[in-house]
Regions:
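Membrane-interfacial catalytic/cofactor-binding modules of polytopic membrane enzymes
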Residues: 186-249
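Membrane-interface helix-loop-helix junctions at boundaries between adjacent transmembrane segments
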Residues: 75-163
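Transmembrane helix interruption/hinge and helix-loop junction motifs
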Residues: 21-29, 76-83, 122-130, 285-294
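Hydrophobic core of alpha-helical transmembrane segments in multi-pass integral membrane proteins
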Residues: 11-20, 62-77, 88-99, 110-123, ...
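Extracellular/periplasmic helix-loop-helix junctions in multi-pass membrane proteins
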Residues: 237, 262-268, 281-303
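Hydrophobic core segments of alpha-helical transmembrane domains in multi-pass membrane proteins
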Residues: 29-39, 84-94, 130-142, 191, ...
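N-terminal signal-anchor module of multipass membrane proteins
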Residues: 1-52, 288
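Membrane-interface helix-boundary motifs at transmembrane edges
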Residues: 2, 47-58, 99-109, 151-164, ...
Length: 329
């Protein structure tokens, strides 16, 4: 009964996120990223830390923190060409930590991952960067993995409401790409364009992904417009923005709906104070200057993505187990 209520709440949150994204996708994204994003990073990292980041050994998470530190160094010294390799190594290295207990096997696995990563970084740099620097920390994190968490919950409970939640999640996502952009009410000001500038490449690359599937209208848009026109004013650019805004908004709301997971009442006063102070400063910086807010929260944003990798892997393993269990019955 409690699980059904949670699923129902999440269905309502999906529909609400979609409804707002249809009309004001740019404003919605910028708002939730600045206001809900920092609180999400802080509370999720706090929750993951209490569960040892779902790793098998007590100090395994130092591996992830080491690569978070390297990513910070690449950002400070303008060495972002190494970012995809570092994220790739952290992603598959986290998987190796879950699978191997032996220190020797872990070391050999890490060497193998680094070698493969360096080869991909050298010979397939464009696509390698696209996947591991752009899509994995953004749309894969907020949409694909959120969808997998919903699927795992539905498989575990086998409830009709759980199945309904995954159907609604997919339906909302598809609907946002199909509903006419003529009803868009976003006010595209110079300030909005400037605030969104750092995210613009995500929209462009996602449009290119859809172009790969040979949508004639998208091909025409890409060929005949500049980047700002494509992202902020074209029909499919607006539809892609709706999808991104929905994915991020629901990702955050889904997390905050899990009050039994966050357990505010069990969090120490000092931790709560630290969380709210950092959150308040972050929102204030975003309000003052959006780009300053992004720079301030870069480390926290990328850290929460990387620290969730073991949980992402564990969820995929659990989904496989659930499917295998149910098909064998």
């Amino acid at each position: 009964m409690i699980r059904n209520n949670i699923d129902l709440v999440n269905i309502v949150l999906m529909v609400l996120s979609m409804a707002v994204a249809v009309f004001i996708p740019f404003e919605l994204f910028l708002f939730v990223y600045a206001v809900l994003g920092p609180m999400h990073y802080l509370t999720e990292i706090n929750w993951l830390h209490g569960r040892n980041y779902f790793l098998t050994r007590k100090n395994d998470y130092f591996f992830i923190f080491f690569f978070i530190g390297l990513l910070l160094v690449t950002s400070i010294f303008q060495l972002k060409g190494y970012s995809p390799l570092l994220i790739f190594t952290t992603f598959f290295g986290s998987l190796a930590l879950l699978f191997f207990e032996s220190g020797t096997k872990r070391f050999l696995a890490l060497i193998g991952i680094l070698v493969v990563g360096m080869l991909l970084n050298t010979f397939c740099f464009y696509h390698f960067r696209l996947v591991f620097s752009m899509f994995l920390p953004s749309i894969v994190h907020v949409f694909i993995f959120t969808g997998l968490f919903i699927l795992l919950g539905a498989l575990k409970t086998r409830s009709k409401m759980g199945i309904a939640s995954i159907v609604v999640f997919i339906s909302c996502s598809v609907a946002l790409l199909l509903i006419s952009s003529n009803i868009n009410q976003s006010s595209i000001s110079a300030n909005l364009i400037d605030s969104y500038r750092i995210f613009r490449n995500l929209n462009i690359k996602m449009i290119e992904v859809f172009q790969f599937f040979h949508f004639p209208e998208i091909k025409e848009n890409i060929g005949n417009t500049n980047d700002n026109q494509l992202v902020f004013f074209s029909d499919f650019g607006i539809k892609i923005m709706r999808f991104i805004a929905f994915a991020y908004t629901y990702h955050y709301l889904n997390w905050f709906s899990k009050t039994s997971v966050i357990q505010w009442h069990k969090t120490s006063t000092m931790k709560l104070l630290a969380i709210f102070v950092i959150w308040f400063v972050s929102v204030a910086l975003y309000t003052y200057n959006y780009k300053v807010g992004l720079q301030w929260l870069y480390l926290l944003s990328i850290a929460h993505v990387l620290l969730e990798f073991p949980l992402n892997h564990k969820s995929l393993i659990d989904i496989r187990k659930q499917l295998k269990s149910q098909t064998s019955q």
